[in-house]
Amino acid sequence: MVKAKMVKACNTKNTGMQPYRVIQDEHISRLLEIGVGSGLLTDALFENFSVDTLYLNDLYDNIQTNALPKDIDANYLIGDIGMIDLPKTLDGVISSSALQWIYPPDVLFKRVFQTLTAGGFFAASTFVEGNLSEIQALTGRGLPYDTPKQLMVRLNQAGFMIDEFKADEQVLYFDSPMAVLRHLKATGVTAVGTEQACWSKQSLAKFCQNYQQFHTDAGYTLTYRPLLFVAHKPMKPMSSPL
């Protein structure tokens, strides 16, 4: 039940799905969210779970203005998740549209594994190879992405057992190449070097001209490759293969 609910909670932020109605509450004692941002995943969390102690991480301290339930014990961990100390004995770690900034993620995965209690879960959405393929094709810029298989191997090597693992492809359509750039600036979920400050008048015109190859009857395409996973720390250490 926890696995199914957490998949849906992470999916809420990634796809714009509305939080679903809760029938049975689940309780989590100690939980960490990596990359809180505007708090969409946090909101979905409290629609479906009760939490005693919540640790909220982000690079920026403005997350402290996000609305939270009055009775929650909230603790803010401001800074690079790869550099700061993680809380101990967590029951769960969640993240949405943030892990792609950490590459390779092996060290973080191992740290998350170590801080979880036996049976604790790690649930997240991120992006995989092929994400924003149109932008990378035109600019040669973008974040490095794993294939789904590579990401699964990293989780297994950190010690996790995989419960849910699903890659998807979502194609958005826009009225113009400039609308694509405005969307990327507004979302800020991935670095592609498309900030307008980086463009000259000539390079921007060339980009818009070259983007014509991605025009369809429905509009100009922009492809996302999100991936959702839920994994857990085994109750007993996994035996190494002979």
Functional labels for PLM-detected ranges:
Residues 91-105, 126:
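A short SAM/SAH-binding and catalytic strip from SAM-dependent methyltransferases
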Residues 106-121:
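A short glycine-rich, Lys/Arg-flanked "PGG" loop and its adjoining helix->strand segment in the class I
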Residues 32-84:
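Class I SAM-dependent methyltransferase SAM/SAH-binding core
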Residues 38-40, 146, 164-242:
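Conserved Class I S-adenosyl-L-methionine
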Residues 82-93:
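A short acidic, Gly/Pro-enriched loop at the edge of an enzyme's catalytic core
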Residues 1-23:
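Class I SAM-dependent methyltransferase Rossmann-like catalytic core
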Residues 144-159:
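Short alpha-helix
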